[in-house]
Amino acid sequence: MRHLFNTDAEIYEAIVKEYERQFYHLELIASENFTSLAVMEAQGSVMTNKYAEGLPHKRYYGGCEFVDIAEDLAIERAKALFDAEHANVQPHSGTQANMAVYMAVLKPGDTIMGMDLSHGGHLTHGAKVNFSGKIYNAVYYGVHPETHLIDYDQLYRLAKEHKPKLIVGGASAYPRVIDWAKLREIADSVGAYLMVDMAHYAGLIAGGVYPNPVPYAHFVTSTTHKTLRGPRSGFILCKKEFAKDIDKSVFPGIQGGPLMHVIAAKAVAFKEAMSQEFKEYARQVVANARVLAEEFIKEGFKVVSGGTDSHIVLLDLRDTGLTGREVEEALGKANITVNKNAVPFDPLPPVKTSGIRLGTPAMTTRGMKEDQMRIIARLISKVIKNIGDEKVIEYVRQEVIEMCEQFPLYPELREEINHLAKIKATY
């Protein structure tokens, strides 16, 4: 980082402070993770300089022979990782991956059906504030009021009533296994396409610990970060029969030049996800989440759906009289990073919420296992049960710092920062 250190002190300091925050905080936001240094090196490479509109070997610019190699590798690795017939790795994000599928098969005003945002869905699955709910007629399915599991009977009834052209599977705050086969059965019964947004579960699917939607869905979209532990970006998988439509929808449909440095980083992440070590990582992510949920239940808290099959744990705080925002802020002071989150049938608005969402991907990347999850659950419980007690918050903060030092993050980067700090001290 010496070039940045010498060129832009303000940005350098912001990056160093963000590194220190990541190092000394328990990162429990379910959609966040820590990429490998190899992924970051690829993303920070000379490929950032190259424009490459079009597809590999069919570019609108010259000089693309080496970025073609990177994109070819990313495509083939994505296909192999998820057993897919076709992959487009150019979407800049999960949102743009979803948009590309919509644009490929829908017309404005067509009906789509996705999971209700307040029940665990995502903005791009038809929320009224999002393009998906503005351009298309969105209908929402949800979870059962008692079990908090997807209500497939309701989903079927709504599909029969509204005849959607596309049904969206997947979620951003649903901790359980989703029955992809059931979704396809319902989609077929009304002549709808099935698109699965596996963004949250992609790494678990790659690791073999969560069901793969590819055999069932017409289209599968995803991000490449979260459980997949790659750069912040997206991709699309589909059957060969839809390949041309998807490729044209991405470019020139919704994007111009792809980000070749990010595509190179995706290729690295896909290769990492093919390893036996990654399979063990995915298994540990789920094991950690299950222990976290179990400990919260022992501490007297209500866990939505009674547990988890994934990396997500959703706490319902209504019995505590606290809002998600209050708990998020209190935990933040104790160096524990979570996000406030709606729970099913939440009476509070999104800026407050009645719950918090936690996830285990980032802490598992740092090497933490079941014993650490038990400690983390107890520390979080201590803060919630003593909300507003600054002595308790400081005690927990010190415990967190000590734990984080036992599982260092990017030690090579830390050495470089310390070296540059010594140089700065001599100025």
Swiss-Prot record:
Predominant place of localization: cytoplasm
Write down the PROSITE patterns for this protein, in alphabetical order. Answer: SHMT (PS00096)
Describe its function: Its primary function is to catalyze the reversible interconversion of serine and glycine with tetrahydrofolate (THF) serving as the one-carbon carrier. This reaction serves as the major source of one-carbon groups required for the biosynthesis of purines, thymidylate, methionine, and other important biomolecules. Also exhibits THF-independent aldolase activity toward beta-hydroxyamino acids, producing glycine and aldehydes, via a retro-aldol mechanism. Thus, is able to catalyze the cleavage of L-threonine, L-allo-threonine, L-threo-beta-phenylserine and L-erythro-beta-phenylserine.
Which reaction(s) does the protein catalyse, per the Swiss-Prot or TrEMBL entry? (6R)-5,10-methylene-5,6,7,8-tetrahydrofolate + glycine + H2O = (6S)-5,6,7,8-tetrahydrofolate + L-serine; L-threonine = acetaldehyde + glycine; L-allo-threonine = acetaldehyde + glycine
Q: Which GO terms describe its biological process?
A: glycine biosynthetic process from serine; tetrahydrofolate interconversion
Which NCBIfam families does the UniProt entry name for this protein?
PRK00011.1
Where is the protein situated, by its record's location annotation? Cytoplasm
Family membership = Belongs to the SHMT family.
Pfam families attached here? SHMT
Identify residues that carry N6-(pyridoxal phosphate)lysine.
Answer: K226
Q: In which pathway does it act?
A: One-carbon metabolism; tetrahydrofolate interconversion; Amino-acid biosynthesis; glycine biosynthesis; glycine from L-serine: step 1/1
Cofactor(s) it depends on: pyridoxal 5'-phosphate
- Provide details of activity as a function of temperature: Highly thermostable. Retains almost complete THF-independent L-allo-threonine aldolase activity after being incubated at 75 degrees Celsius for 10 minutes, and retains about 77% residual activity after being treated at 87 degrees Celsius for the same time.
Q: Name one GO molecular function term.
A: L-allo-threonine aldolase activity
Spell out the GO cellular component terms annotated for this protein, sorted alphabetically and separated by semicolons: cytosol
Oligomeric form and interacting partners: Homodimer.
Q: Which residues bind (6S)-5,6,7,8-tetrahydrofolate?
A: L117, G121, H122, L123
Site (Plays an important role in substrate specificity): which residue positions? H225
**EC number from the UniProt entry:** 2.1.2.1, 4.1.2.48
Q: Which domain of life, per UniProt? A: Bacteria
Q: What is this protein called?
A: Serine hydroxymethyltransferase
As for pH, the annotation reads:
Optimum pH is 7.4 for the THF-independent L-allothreonine aldolase activity. More than 95% of full activity remains at pH 8.4, although the activities are reduced to about 90% at pH 6.9 and about 75% at pH 5.9.
Which keywords label this protein?
Amino-acid biosynthesis, Cytoplasm, Lyase, One-carbon metabolism, Pyridoxal phosphate, Transferase
